[in-house]
UniProtKB/Swiss-Prot annotation:
The keyword DNA-binding does not apply. Plasticins have huge conformational plasticity. They can display random coil, alpha-helical, beta-sheet or beta-harpin structures. Peptide with no antimicrobial activity. May act in synergy with cationic peptides by enhancing their activity. Has a moderate hemolytic activity. This is Plasticin-A1. GO terms for cellular component: extracellular region; membrane; other organism cell membrane. Residues 25-45 are annotated as: Disordered. Residues 1-22 form the signal peptide. Transmembrane segments: none annotated. Belongs to the frog skin active peptide (FSAP) family. Plasticin subfamily. It is found in: Secreted; Target cell membrane. One of its GO terms (biological process) is killing of cells of another organism. It comes from the Eukaryota. It comes from Agalychnis annae.
Length: 73
């Protein structure tokens, strides 16, 4: 009976160890994916901010050019 208990314990132990390793790898992959998503959203925010600023400056420039040409007529 003791042999059966030891064998069962060994089988359970050998099944649990790979599961814990797989869980750890899965968590690491999820963390890497989350970091990549954060980096991409940060880049998108930076690009959209630059485009908004450039659009605002261009709009101001065109507005001032329009007022100059309108004032000369």
């Amino acid at each position: 009976m003791a042999f059966l208990k030891k064998s069962l314990f060994l089988v359970l132990f050998l099944a649990i160890v790979p599961l814990s390793i797989c869980e750890e790898e899965k968590r690491e992959e999820e963390n890497e994916e989350k970091q990549e998503d954060d980096d991409q959203s940060e880049k998108r925010g930076l690009v959209s901010g630059l485009l908004n600023t450039a659009g605002g400056l261009l709009g101001d420039l065109l507005g001032s050019l329009g007022s100059l040409s309108g004032g000369e007529s």
